């Protein structure tokens, strides 16, 4: 009997790797949850033509995304469209945080994709001290204060809305085209190059040299560095270090797809997703044997 929000496997990411893992989890009748965007992979969607996927020559990224979505629907796999802001290794299980909710899983598969937006100076150093990746988690700390919000995806504008409803002033820099507008939101035309402050974030410096004083900085990214998401995760050249079975240095945690490094290929991602899922099942079986 499972508790509410308790799963065998949590899969983070709805690119080809995460979808591959989810499909195989459904086939193996595991209790799992799939986190990600209902629009699946923006990277795949933008691909004009994919010519190296076996048996599907010259398929567009848009069509491939549509076929992946249809496969999920056919298998009654539901996407939980919540952004995971933290994964915590509790020893024999993992706790995942998404907004105000908690999810428990015995194993985790990271299919978060390659980090497309590089961290800026001070971002990691001041994380938790004025820098946040989660609007709903930390927004209430900035009621009637001045904040900066840096976003790389339109889907996060609901979170921008949430923050604008709390803060006195919001400096907003979207790295994409948008007509988002709100009375207390000022659009920045120059990107931030650093978060300033010693013990706590107190401002940002822009590429044009301007300095803006703020009380906090929110980065609303499609994906954050995996070792920020899960502390203690071993990295190699900016990617998650994995063995051939897609296991990481943390027991029960597996990774697949672009987040494990080059080559960034759809066929590779799908194969790794399959491997990660079967390795997770092997891990769960061993875990169950120890308990019994």
For the regions a language model picked out, list residue spans one by one.
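Beta1-alpha1 glycine-rich phosphate/pyrophosphate-binding loop at the start
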Residues: 7-63, 67-71, 145-179
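Short loop/helix-cap segments at secondary-structure boundaries that form the rim of catalytic
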Residues: 25, 46, 120-124, 140-142, ...
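Structured catalytic cores of enzymes that bind and process phosphorylated ligands/cofactors
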Residues: 2, 7-33, 96-98, 187-196, ...
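Short, well-ordered coil/turn residues at beta-beta hairpins
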Residues: 13, 111-113, 150, 218-221, ...
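Short glycine-/acidic-enriched loop or helix-start segments at secondary-structure transitions
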Residues: 21, 44, 89, 119-121, ...
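FAD-binding core/adjacent interface of flavoenzyme oxidoreductases
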Residues: 1-12, 79-144, 217-218, 241-244, ...
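A Rossmann-like FAD-binding core segment of flavoenzymes
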Residues: 72-90, 95-97, 103, 165-244, ...
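FAD-site-proximal beta/loop scaffold in flavoenzymes
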Residues: 119, 125-141, 220-268, 272-282
């Amino acid at each position: 009997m499972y508790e509410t929000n308790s799963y065998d496997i949590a899969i983070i990411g709805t690119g080809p790797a995460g979808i591959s893992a989810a499909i195989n989890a459904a086939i193996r009748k595991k209790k799992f949850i799939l986190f990600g965007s209902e629009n699946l992979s923006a990277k795949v969607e933008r691909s004009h033509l994919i010519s190296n996927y076996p048996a599907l020559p010259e398929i567009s990224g848009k069509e491939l995304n549509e076929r992946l979505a249809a496969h999920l629907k056919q298998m009654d796999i539901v996407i939980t469209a919540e952004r995971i802001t933290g994964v915590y290794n509790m020893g024999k299980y993992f706790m995942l945080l998404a907004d105000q909710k908690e999810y428990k899983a015995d194993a985790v598969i990271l299919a978060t994709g390659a980090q497309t937006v590089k961290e800026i100076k001070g971002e990691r150093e001041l994380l938790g001290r004025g820098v946040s990746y989660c609007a709903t988690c930390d927004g209430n700390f900035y009621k009637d204060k001045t904040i900066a919000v840096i976003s790389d995806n339109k889907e996060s504008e609901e979170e921008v809305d949430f923050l604008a409803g709390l803060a006195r002033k919001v400096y907003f820099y979207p790295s994409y085209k948008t007509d988002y507008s709100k009375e207390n939101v000022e659009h920045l035309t120059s990107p931030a190059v650093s978060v300033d402050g010693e013990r706590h974030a107190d401002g940002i410096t822009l590429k044009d040299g301007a300095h803006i004083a703020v009380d906090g900085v929110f980065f609303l990214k499609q994906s954050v560095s995996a070792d920020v998401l899960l502390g203690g995760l071993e990295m190699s050249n900016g990617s998650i270090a994995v063995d051939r079975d897609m296991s990481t240095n943390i027991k029960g945690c597996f990774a697949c797809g672009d987040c494990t490094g080059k080559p960034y290929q759809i066929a590779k991602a799908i194969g790794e997703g399959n491997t990660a899922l079967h390795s997770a099942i092997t891990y769960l079986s061993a875990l169950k044997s120890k308990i019994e």
